[in-house]
Regions:
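Beta-strand-turn-beta hairpins that frame and shape the catalytic cleft
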Residues: 1-24
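Short, glycine/serine-rich, charged loops/turns that create anion-binding
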Residues: 20-22, 77, 228
């Protein structure tokens, strides 16, 4: 698990990245399923600030502050309704009151579930949400396991899964097994984050933990990034990397 704070036009956005254990290849003790559930739970506790068992390098305990902007990214190896993970594993994030489900879809995912058949025919998750193209005979079939999940209050302008249909010229980039790139599909979102504090709100209480700010500025809460502004961000997460595009005035800058 990585919490990477990124400053976007004066507002801190916490990129929360992880790759929980696949809930498969298990013995009778189901160790991998349990690890997957708990590794997902860590972020659920962290964004709800109920993670008293966690502490940072300065010894401060807990997770993010209530007004923190964040986006959870990665391959979480858990589908809401299908696959091998424990029931409710990914719902710890998808149903959290702190999190927005961007619900990205693709035409290719729905089409492939129909064409490939097998386990896909008995799945309960809408195949338009699928992000992974896995073995269908006998299982697990295609699954939704890759996510871009921002904090509540974030404006989701666009979201999707890059999974072209077979008649699309870009299908060569995803293809069929053995895949030319990955069995995971790129999940992307264009997000506009809320500002952390409005200019009329008081400064954070000195009783709350603070982090040093440049000379002449009020201190900020260590995990909040309490600045005004409405930063826009486009995010894509796929196998092996993350692309973050931020809009600053009339220019675009990219960070990878």
């Amino acid at each position: 698990h990585v919490d990477l704070p990124i400053d976007v036009d004066g507002t801190t956005i916490h990129v929360l990245a992880a790759h929980p254990t696949p809930p498969s290849f298990d013995g009778a003790e189901q160790r991998n399923k349990k690890r997957n559930f708990d590794e997902i739970r860590l972020w659920a506790d962290y964004v709800a600030n109920r993670a008293d068992s966690l502490y940072d390098d300065n010894g401060a305990k807990g997770g993010l502050t209530e007004d923190a902007n964040f986006v959870i990214l990665g391959d979480y190896n858990s589908d809401p309704l299908d696959g091998d993970s424990y029931p409710g594993a990914i719902d710890q994030l998808l149903t959290s009151p702190q999190i927005v489900d961007t619900a990205p879809t693709s035409l290719g995912g729905a089409r492939e579930a129909e064409l490939q058949g097998g386990a896909n025919l008995t799945h309960r998750t809408n195949p338009a949400y699928d992000t992974g193209d896995f073995g269908d005979n006998p299982r697990p079939g295609n699954l939704r396991i890759d996510y871009v999940l921002p904090n509540v209050g974030t404006q989701v302008e666009e979201a999707g899964v890059f999974w072209p249909t077979r008649d699309d010229e870009l299908f060569r980039l995803t293809g069929l097994a053995p895949f030319p790139t990955s069995d995971h599909r790129l999940v992307w979102s264009k997000l506009r984050f809320p500002r952390s504090l409005t200019p009329s709100e008081p400064n954070p209480s000195t009783s709350q933990r603070e982090t040093p700010s440049p000379s002449g500025e009020e201190p900020r809460l260590a995990n909040s990034g309490a600045h005004s502004g409405l930063p826009g961000v486009a995010i894509g997460v796929g196998a092996g990397g993350v692309l973050l595009l931020t809009r600053q005035r009339a220019r675009l800058r990219s960070q990878a």
